[in-house]
Amino acid sequence: MKNSFFDVRCDEKSEKWEMAIKREIPIYLRNDIRSEFERDYTRILHCDAYRRLKHKTQVFYATKNDHVCTRMEHVMHVASVASTICKFLGLNEKLAEAIALGHDIGHAPFGHHGEDCLNSLMEQKEGANAPKKFWHERNSLFFADYIETLPDPDGIQQPLNLTYAVRDGLICHCGEIDQQGIKPRTDAMDLYSIKRPGLIQPFTWEGCVVKVADKIAYLGRDIEDARQYHILDMAAYRHIREIVASTLNAKGSHAFRSGKAVNTTVLINDLIVDLCEQSSPEKGLCFSDEYFKFILELKKFNIAHIYNHWRLREFTVYASNCLQTIYRTLMRTYDYALNGRVERALRYYPNLSGTFENWLIKHSNYKVLSSNGLIDKKKVLRYNTEAVFNIEDRESYEKCVIEFISGMTDSFAMQVFGEIIEF
């Protein structure tokens, strides 16, 4: 029902409001007409991690096809879906848009395979049963809190310093857990105490909407992109018709011709309308039983016919080799880092040497070797950033390397890999 969530929206009347707009550090003030969440939206929009999403994988790796979805287009789809839902239900669409825009800024190159690869590198010392160390939801929060910066009015690079509600939405956005009746949790918490993706619900209804919107946005679009690459054969198309017929009580041939389950715009519209019709503050965010079953079956279809297709599996071998080679190369610089000579150690890899040393300067206690000894260039480069990595601790240095790689685009990772293996 329209505006049925108006009384639970995150605004000045909400009992959660003061916590929702809280920032770790009071942000600098100037003549501004934006709300707190609009300000977060534009801070994310202008940060480098968001800009790099245009060259990060959504499903199809390092695509050169202008019409295939990248990670940046995906987050815009999520923002659009979340905004539409919030506007109809009476929720704060500006909060949802800010969360959606930033929800993947910590995503690894090469999509979820890249994420799994970086996680395996961090887990290799602890064995296969170790808790997951690298997951992009937490990494998006980490990037927002400690990595990404913007210049203030004096030209000093300052942290993004986002509101609690947006930060919470980043780490709690996991859309991979199939749930009905999603409701926000009651209490604020230390967001870094969350140990696994999908276990904790967001603090706001708007965060819950983004969590659902993430799933709505990718299901149909992934099928559309698979069609661009002729990934789906006739048997797959028949399977889609069968899914529509068995779950939505529609004739398969008619549903297929009308574009259902293939045309992303039709699919997104149908799922949004069903969610808005079925949801209430009492029931939570939910779909009808028919559409929920349809979502589950379509997700199974995507896994079987798209994500596990041999063409994508072949590329994952290359992607793993690429990320592992960069990781090993950077870990070999550890002794050089202690002496301020990382750029020299990587001098044969011009795209890697300067960017990695600058990363160390900005985010660690690394000091550069000069004619006057070791110097800290943070002030020279106007970085007001915390040294979140300690280069004197090898484990912290390893974490630093992993985070640096996670920020790479597909294209930059491939370029660096090429430098390393060429003679």
Regions found by a protein language model. Name each.
Residues S83-L95:
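Short pre-active-site segment immediately N-terminal to the catalytic Zn-binding motif
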Residues A96-L101, K211:
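Short alpha-helical catalytic segment bearing the HExxH-like zincin motif
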Residues L101, G114-E115, G175, K215:
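An acidic- and aromatic-residue-enriched active-site/binding cleft used to recognize and process polar
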Residues G102-F110, A217:
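Short active-site segment of divalent metal-dependent hydrolases/proteases
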